[in-house]
Regions:
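Glycine-rich hexapeptide-repeat left-handed beta-helix
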Residues: 116-117, 127-283
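Terminal amphipathic alpha-helical/low-complexity segments used for targeting or macromolecular assembly
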Residues: 1-61, 226-284
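Extended beta-solenoid/beta-helix repeat architectures
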Residues: 47-158, 173-174, 183, 189, ...
């Protein structure tokens, strides 16, 4: 052991400020701050420009353009973008369809599409997503589809999630009480009045699904319910109004291959083995 405590004094260090996020709902709180930091990063790296030609062409529908970074994008007619409350960052290859309203702070990732008549604010949308309806204070990871009408608020959504048309979450209790979140057998006091749902990778919901405040849906779950589903659905679960059962792992893997192939992506052996091991673990 060559460690010498006396040498610690000679080590150069720099104090930095960090934010510790213990839970996913902590990340939602810092959407605005993180997008502000990202704007500085993008501007410094020169990855996205101010796109002056775009601003000149669309000046009547853009508010506070100095707080926007727009890449090589397709913006259809009658899109309103308001960066008064925070930056709007639109990455390359994004399509924003007609009659959509975007409010900062907002980041839309590379290759994503925003459907017509959408309203999106204070959110982070990952790459290659298809987004529609209303979003407020939501983090969505890559390749997730929420194409159709419906509301998502104060929520964290994983990758490769597919929301059926009309899927909507509640982010406020009728009695304005603080929302609790159950994960496995433990209940957490979030101390938040506004809180939506936490959806794992590869979750699918049927049309018209109603998601309660503080709901947690485990990765690989399939939700088919005309009523409010359970607020705590375990991983790889087939959920219906008749009850819960385990998703067949071979069928799940087959669906993942099909889904990714449609988007030009491979479901590789590492990820497949991860889910097979996960299935064996939850079956015990």
């Amino acid at each position: 052991n060559n460690f010498n405590p006396k040498k610690i004094k000679s080590i150069k260090f720099k104090r930095i400020d960090i934010i510790l996020c213990r839970y996913l709902w902590d990340i939602i709180d810092y959407i605005g701050k993180n997008i502000n930091d990202d704007k500085k990063y993008f501007a410094h790296q020169g990855k996205l420009s101010g796109n002056s030609k775009f601003f000149e062409k669309n000046s009547k529908k853009l508010i506070n353009t100095q707080n926007m970074l727009i890449g090589r994008v397709e913006i259809q007619p009658n899109v309103v973008m308001d960066a008064t409350s925070g930056p709007i960052i639109i990455d390359d290859n994004v399509t924003i369809k007609s009659n959509t309203h975007l409010e900062g702070p907002l980041y839309v990732g590379n290759g994503s599409t925003i459907s017509p008549l959408s309203y999106v604010k204070n959110s982070v949308i990952g790459p290659m997503c298809k987004i529609g309806g209303e979003l407020n204070s939501v983090v969505i990871e890559g390749y997730t589809n929420k194409v159709h009408y419906g509301f998502l608020g104060n929520s964290y959504i994983g990758e490769w999630v597919n929301f059926g048309a009309g899927t909507t979450n509640s982010n406020l209790k009728n009695n304005y009480g603080k929302v609790r979140v159950q994960m496995n057998d433990e209940v957490f006091e979030t101390n938040r009045i506004h809180l939506g749902c936490f959806i794992g990778d590869y979750v699918k919901t049927s049309i018209g699904t109603k998601i309660n405040t503080g709901s947690v849906y485990g990765p690989g779950s399939m939700i088919f319910s005309k009523d409010f589903p359970s607020k705590n659905i375990p991983i790889l679960t087939w959920y219906t109004d008749s009850g819960m059962s385990r998703v067949g792992i071979d069928k799940f893997i087959l669906n993942c291959h099909r889904m990714k192939k449609r988007r030009g992506v491979d479901f590789d052996i590492v990820e497949e083995q991860f889910y097979r091991n996960l299935f064996l673990k939850v079956e015990k």
